[in-house]
Amino acid sequence: MISSFHRPTVARVNLQAIKENVASVQKHIPLGVKTYAVVKADAYGHGAVQVSKALLPQVDGYCVSNLDEALQLRQAGIDKEILILGVLLPNELKLAITRQVTVTVASLEWLAMAKQEWPDLKGLKVHIKIDSGMGRIGLRSVTEVDNLIAGLKSMGADVEGIFTHFATADEADDTKFNQQLQFFKKLIAGLEDKPRLVHASNSATSIWHSDTIFNAVRLGIVSYGLNPSGSDLSLPFPLQEALSLESSLVHVKMISAGDTVGYGATYTAKKSEYVGTVPIGYADGWTRNMQGFSVLVDGQFCEIIGRVSMDQLTIRLSKAYPLGTKVTLIGSNQQKNISTTDIANYRNTINYEVLCLLSDRIPRIY
């Protein structure tokens, strides 16, 4: 999907806010802890290359989801460590070794496949993934991990790190969190050959469980100024939301009582009113179910009426505003604000998803 530069819909990304958010977390966690910036999914929709370059002086490395995301950073000149958090199958290892990308290994089956596909792992840096209770990828026993580490080292790999991921670090009830933490600690303590880096802290753990940090953290959503819990838990320090989303009115008209708006005729005017059309829709990540939510025009909340279309939405206006009038979908407009979390709550989802759904059809302005 190409970016649409010839329409007024844009996302503005404040890189300075991202840098300050990361600095706030770094002040909150123990000294000497390594920081990895999580820039997967195009830095949660903010632009992985631009964010990575902005954070280059502040962080020790980056986390991505897959090899393609890692290669994008390498091609952009990012030379610090890049860890792939997902599983890279052994047939892609040559490229990972050549471009000095650190991979996650999560099973003995992977090791067996590597012996067949690419038995010489010299130059490969590895982090071992532990499933402490998330139920996704990872090993579950000390014996498995010991065997995996020994096998990887025998093939020439540098087993630099070991890590896990918490399922409920952003919830008030820490029962599950503590179960996972104790599982991970016990496993680490039982290893014959412990890797140099041990990390379990995502954004939520770094904020609300900073006393449980090992020697590295992975900062994702908090870097972009959002509360990992949505609004369930209070933040110990302020954050700046880094992305705003805006457009403009491209059509304004008066409709009469009884007129309908949008697909399915789901909105019927009860009286004569002004309506405005805004060029953003579900193809941009502004989902179809946003009817009834509001955007900001001239410091006023204006309701979205009718279903959101692929490329457009329609709002009720208090008067006939001129074409080109600014419309704020995320961010501030004359002392009023719409946050990403507000949108997530309306959609019954999480703020992460709202950002990640913003398509690359929307240009990012830095």
Curated annotation (Swiss-Prot):
Instruction: Select a single GO molecular function from the record's annotations and give it.
Output: alanine racemase activity
Q: In which pathway does it act?
A: Amino-acid biosynthesis; D-alanine biosynthesis; D-alanine from L-alanine: step 1/1
Return the similarity comment.
Answer: Belongs to the alanine racemase family.
Q: Which Gene3D superfamilies match?
A: Alanine racemase (3.20.20.10), Lyase, Ornithine Decarboxylase, Chain A, domain 1 (2.40.37.10)
Q: Which residues carry this modification: N6-(pyridoxal phosphate)lysine?
A: 40
What PROSITE patterns does the record point to? ALANINE_RACEMASE (PS00395)
Q: Which GO terms describe its cellular component?
A: cytosol
Question: What gene is this protein translated from?
Answer: alr
Q: Enumerate the residues binding substrate.
A: 136, 310
What keywords would UniProt list here? Isomerase, Pyridoxal phosphate
Primary role: Catalyzes the interconversion of L-alanine and D-alanine. May also act on other amino acids.
- What's the protein called, per UniProt? Alanine racemase
Pfam families xrefs: Ala_racemase_C (PF00842), Ala_racemase_N (PF01168)
What organism does the record attribute this protein to? Streptococcus pyogenes serotype M6 (strain ATCC BAA-946 / MGAS10394)
Record has Isomerase as a keyword: yes
- Name the residues annotated as catalytic in the UniProt entry: 40 (proton acceptor), 263 (proton acceptor)
